[in-house]
Curated annotation (Swiss-Prot):
Pfam families: Trypsin
Protein name: Serine protease 28
Entry similarity comment: Belongs to the peptidase S1 family.
Residue span, Peptidase S1 domain: 31-274
Source species: Mus musculus
Gene behind this protein: Prss28
Length: 274
């Protein structure tokens, strides 16, 4: 089994939880504090791939979610540039193990949120259109999106899923099975206080805006390779995606991680997928 190429990409404020395909070699990427997940439990989860000439294969760089039979939602920082060529990306669906013998799906179009800011990570969202409609099944189906009027808080049952590192320097081992972890949503005011209480300038500089959502606790949350993945909550007898993994510091070590809030971009999402 070949190795994933990972890089902790630092921005001015924090670290994005993205795997890299071009800089250095390390073992492949699971969620901090998580457990293995069985097939079919999270049928909207996808692995976003880019081709690596170093290992001559399509390697995992980010997570994503199926929100429509032809559309994937992920993080904007997972995409190389505003005019990125869709042909350099592929998507794996319906599988809990990375790198099983499976046909990867082609992307025909990429749309980055028009208000995305690469420094602050505001509106860190991107849509990817598949070249063909998915055939839904037990293992492949879209997740529900929230309503504008929906509310989510620490009392909700919310889960994060991904193939990211188990700890900052502890990658997932073969067979690279998808991991899940239950994490609490935190209100933005408490999240801001938590960051400002830290002594380092890096922590204090983190800005949390209304289009962001905080979730996770010490030892439970996303790490490198989890960017773009969905945060889902059980509400009204269905799973609803409330967030997209965006940024954090030290792989969920002491602080909540920061997600893009899906509700803040519903109009933009529906404009393109309908």
């Amino acid at each position: 089994m070949f190795r994933l190429l990972l890089l902790a990409l630092s921005c001015l404020e924090s670290t994005v939880f993205m795997a890299s395909v071009s800089i250095s070699r390390s073992k492949p990427v699971g969620i901090v504090g998580g457990q293995r997940t069985p097939p079919g439990k999270w049928p909207w989860q996808v692995s976003l791939r880019m081709y690596s000439y170093e290992v001559n294969s399509w390697v995992h760089i980010c997570g994503g979610s199926i929100i429509h039979p032809q559309w994937i939602l992920t993080a904007a920082h997972c995409i190389q540039s505003q005019d990125a060529d869709p042909a350099v990306y592929r998507v794996q669906v319906g599988e809990v193990y990375l790198y099983k013998e499976q046909e990867l799906l082609n992307i025909s179009r990429i749309i980055i949120h028009p208000d995305y800011n690469d420094v602050s990570k505001r509106f860190d969202l991107a849509l990817m259109q598949l070249t063909a409609l998915l055939v839904t099944s037990t293992n492949v189906s879209p997740v529900s999106l929230p309503k504008d009027s929906s509310t989510f808080d620490s009392t909700d049952q919310c889960w994060l899923v991904g193939w990211g590192n188990l700890l900052q320097r502890v990658p997932l081992q073969p067979p690279y099975q998808l991991h899940e972890v239950k994490i609490p949503i935190q209100d933005n005011k408490s999240c801001k206080r938590a960051y400002r209480k830290k002594s380092s300038d890096e922590h204090k500089a983190v800005a949390i805006f209304d289009d962001m959502l905080c979730a996770g606790t010490s030892g439970r949350g996303p790490c490198f390779g989890d960017s773009g993945g969905p945060l889902v909550c059980w509400k009204s007898n269905k799973w609803i995606q409330v967030g997209v993994v965006s940024k954090g510091i030290d792989c969920s070590n002491n602080l909540p991680s920061i997600f893009s809030r899906v509700q803040s971009s519903l109009a933009w999402i529906h404009q393109h997928i309908q």
